[in-house]
Amino acid sequence: MKITGLFKEFFESEKSSGLFLISCTLFSLVIANSAIANSYLHFWHANLAGNSLEYWINDGLMTIFFLLIGLELEREVYDGELSNIKDAMLPIFGAIGGMIVPAGLFLVMNFGTKTQSGAGIPMATDIAFALAILSLLGNKIPLSLKIFLTALAVIDDLGAILIIAVFYTKTLLWTNLCIALGIFGFLLILNRLKIRNLIPYLIGGVFMWYFMLHSGVHATITGVLLAFAIPFGNGDSRSTSYILQHFLHKPVAFFILPLFALANTAIVLSSNISETLIQNYSIGIALGLIIGKPLGIFLLSMLAVSLGICKLPDDLNWKSILAVGFLGGIGFTMSIFITLLAFNDDTIINNAKFVILISSLIAGIIGYFSLKYVLKNTIIENKN
């Protein structure tokens, strides 16, 4: 398996960010259920330029997160794990399985109800949290497993982006959408003309975000489009894409995602938690993340290898693929993000966030201990 120049930096920042995110989440949950809860909740909903602070984080700052995801995906396509179609097929099939099966389980529980729109919730993977859990196992983790999980999560996020664009766009203002796409086309022309200066791309990106925001399509899509408009060149440290990607790693990991977590995990816990957990949408989310994710990743990966479409890396086995599949069930920030688009009822949103947190925690614990067991046995077998 191939490793890109920025992969180690990406992995390090993501795992550190994941641990920081856990701290932010616990802090937010405690404060949201304390004596100062009202002030804390009011802070995130305070008016800022006509919208709440939470709104600007979700529709503004998260666009920068998706820009980084787009740049990572671009690098993987041109110069990384996804550049070789044979190598790319394993995480691609795993990601497809990890989206279809969770969505299917959710729909089994919710089809025909007002909450069926939440099928996209268990389809996403939180890269930062998943890599943070993986990093707790230290140097025991094969490099190919780190790359598999990272590629899987990036493809998952791409799937989530497509889902947001296709299924969570309620009303379209075609004029604004066409202007946004026109700006994207103009930036592609700049790319083809080999204009490497980052400034026109960033200015164009701001205007594209504005018109996308007012088109009905979720504005975060702008981040991914902008990423693929920015010149990749030969991908070395002087390329425009590399410079921006390198610059964004830490602000995204240690500012944007933690801020998103603080704003969106201010969950007021219900006094009747048992009633929350037996709702159809709650069961659907839990089944999707805890069972659907690992099962889908495992089955589709095995199918792809069985059909000769790709091969399993020499230092991996099916037990490790199943174990890492549970880490794919850590939906957290991405699942919460889709929840905000899928539902309008504040009670359902609050309950869904709680179930996402619990399900992600369970998936993470199962993934950690199953991987620890699998890797320990693999080391013993290799010694024998």
Curated annotation (Swiss-Prot):
Annotated membrane topology: Multi-pass membrane protein
Entry superkingdom: Bacteria
Main subcellular localisation: membrane
GO BP, one annotated term: regulation of pH
Any one GO MF annotation of this record: sodium:proton antiporter activity
Keyword Membrane in record: yes
A Pfam cross-reference name: Na_H_antiport_1
Subcellular localization, as worded in the UniProt entry: Cell inner membrane
Family: Belongs to the NhaA Na(+)/H(+) (TC 2.A.33) antiporter family.
Entry protein name: Na(+)/H(+) antiporter NhaA
Native organism taxonomy: Bacteria, Pseudomonadati, Bacteroidota, Flavobacteriia, Flavobacteriales
